[in-house]
Amino acid sequence: MAHVAKKFKAASAKVDRVKRYKLDEAMSLVKQTATKKFDETVDAAINLGVDPKHADQVVRGAVVLPHGMGKAVKIAVFAKGDKAREAQEAGADIVGAEDLAEKVQGGFMDFDKVLATPDMMGVVGRLGKVLGPRGLMPNPKVGTVSADIARAVKEQKAGKVEFRVEKAGIVHVPFGKASFEPEKLKANFSAIMEIIYKAKPQTAKGVYVKNVTLSTTMGPGIKLDLSELAAAHG
């Protein structure tokens, strides 16, 4: 543990806790603060001026990252007939209907994402207690329930990420790996922020994006210069 603490302290020493960093500098710095032997995920914590207790201020959405997430995603699809075939041809790892639902009810969870065609939601809905707590329940608002199931599969395989504001008004979303080049991290992050700004609720008052902090899985937080973000996306 002392060795781990020493590494974290060394990484933290590279970050000025008071400074708000420009994007280019932040993306280079986030790579420097990754100290683990595994390829750490890079996350953004985006503090929004919304009150999620009000339904009209719940910010959620999804975006296909231009450079993906740097990992293979195992996808389960609930579909029948031609739609099942389309899902398989698009690269889905597991495709089924009632048979797949029975497996999931029995404890089968060997997948990262769950997609469904609209006609299958009656079956999938019964899995709410299993899929819901794991954040796997398909939802049309983020494109995981879709009639164009082939496109939905391809987007997930390409690195689609979903986000939803939490109780404290914060959105946590991953946007790459520490091994990515800074330019790729920047492009992925910018794609997320574009959607975040577009998702601003009409009822939100005051400052919308209040704070943004980047970090690797085990690294220190790096605060961003909000004026640069507002100029690019606001």
UniProtKB/Swiss-Prot annotation:
CC per GO annotation: cytosolic large ribosomal subunit
Taxonomic superkingdom: Bacteria
CDD domains: Ribosomal_L1
Record GO biological process: regulation of translation; translation
Stored SUPFAM superfamilies: Ribosomal protein L1
UniProt xrefs under PROSITE patterns: RIBOSOMAL_L1
InterPro entries according to UniProt: Ribosom_uL1_bac-type (IPR005878), Ribosomal_uL1 (IPR002143), Ribosomal_uL1-like (IPR023674), Ribosomal_uL1/biogenesis (IPR028364), Ribosomal_uL1_3-a/b-sand (IPR016095), Ribosomal_uL1_CS (IPR023673)
Keywords in alphabetical order: Repressor, Ribonucleoprotein, Ribosomal protein, RNA-binding, rRNA-binding, Translation regulation, tRNA-binding
GO molecular function list: rRNA binding; structural constituent of ribosome; tRNA binding
Quaternary assembly: Part of the 50S ribosomal subunit.
Function: Binds directly to 23S rRNA. The L1 stalk is quite mobile in the ribosome, and is involved in E site tRNA release. Protein L1 is also a translational repressor protein, it controls the translation of the L11 operon by binding to its mRNA.
UniProt cross-references to HAMAP family, sorted A to Z: Ribosomal_uL1_B (MF_01318_B)
Entry's family note: Belongs to the universal ribosomal protein uL1 family.
Protein name per UniProt: Large ribosomal subunit protein uL1
Record organism: Anaeromyxobacter sp. (strain Fw109-5)
Gene: rplA
